Amino acid sequence: MPRRPLLEFEKPLVELEQQIEQIRQLARDSEVDVTQQLQQLESLASRRRQEIFQGLTPAQKIQVARHPHRPSTLDFIQMFCDDFVELHGDRRGNDDQALIGGVGRLGDRAVLLLGHQKGRDTKENVARNFGMATPGGYRKAMRLMEHADRFRLPILTFIDTPGAYAGLQAEEQGQGEAIAVNLRDMFGLRVPVIATVIGEGGSGGALGIGVADRLLMFEHSVYTVASPEACASILWRDAAKAPDAAAALKITGRDLLELGVVDEVLAEPSGGNNWAPLEAGQTLRAALERHLGELLTLSEQELRDARYTKFRAMGRFAEEMSQEFDDIA
């Protein structure tokens, strides 16, 4: 059955799924052979779903990335990590629930896992602050990463946040400073760091745990300097232009792969990760093990040098003179 709540462009799929369920119910309640009709409808639903999700606009991908049933950091950890033990606190009196972390095993290797954590419903989202971490969350994350560095544990981070919390108290506690320290100190880590955007990666809140040797993204995740709504409000003073901003910001995996920002875009199951979370978990685990195996062949200095070079190469631009200007010159 479809996962609820449903997105606007998924409604044609809902009608097909309802028809499929009605036929299944008919088969259970009677001896009528409906195998052929069921196969035809399931095949049609699969084709429709694939067609819809292959043609998603950037604005629609944002809706998928924000889907409340999309697998979260803890969901993925539970899928493929054995013996996970959560670690708490920034040692300054805070234990932010919007950014969680701990140690566990990926296969036969001990690793540190940390990431943003959203809730499934209003109550959970309030407790998790909708995945928007405070300064205490980023300081906790850095404390755990330093712990991993000390014990030579590879670091796996999972990004899923609209941005760092921008409330008055967060600013008073040094939100900008906390993120800046993370950016600085992550470049000095001597262990492999792999970051994965599993939902939405927004602004400095994403970068605070995103300085990595490899940056992965799911197919329908987004990674952006600012939310399209905020961008539209700033540029056009009209949040209704968010779809235009989403297209201009180049927030999709395909765009960011072409720009050299991300290293790999992970395919999602037909309909997105919320339709088949276990399949998404298998895809992510395979990618993490593959990239981790490659990074573990590098020395500590090679890791740091490559990480520095990777980020220094970002943001370069090319100028192309128009023919008209060239003629004038």
Swiss-Prot record:
Its EC number is 2.1.3.15. It is found in: Cytoplasm. Its main location: cytoplasm. It catalyses: N(6)-carboxybiotinyl-L-lysyl-[protein] + acetyl-CoA = N(6)-biotinyl-L-lysyl-[protein] + malonyl-CoA. One of its GO terms (cellular component) is acetyl-CoA carboxylase complex. Residues 40-294 form the CoA carboxyltransferase C-terminal domain. Pfam families: ACCA. The keyword Lipid metabolism applies. Pathway: Lipid metabolism; malonyl-CoA biosynthesis; malonyl-CoA from acetyl-CoA: step 1/1. One of its GO terms (molecular function) is ATP binding. Keywords: ATP-binding, Cytoplasm, Fatty acid biosynthesis, Fatty acid metabolism, Lipid biosynthesis, Lipid metabolism, Nucleotide-binding, Transferase. One of its GO terms (biological process) is malonyl-CoA biosynthetic process. InterPro entries: Acetyl_CoA_COase_a_su (IPR001095), ClpP/crotonase-like_dom_sf (IPR029045), COA_CT_C (IPR011763). Belongs to the AccA family. Component of the acetyl coenzyme A carboxylase (ACC) complex. First, biotin carboxylase catalyzes the carboxylation of biotin on its carrier protein (BCCP) and then the CO(2) group is transferred by the carboxyltransferase to acetyl-CoA to form malonyl-CoA. HAMAP family: AcetylCoA_CT_alpha. Acetyl-CoA carboxylase is a heterohexamer composed of biotin carboxyl carrier protein (AccB), biotin carboxylase (AccC) and two subunits each of ACCase subunit alpha (AccA) and ACCase subunit beta (AccD). This is Acetyl-coenzyme A carboxylase carboxyl transferase subunit alpha. It comes from Synechococcus sp. (strain CC9902).
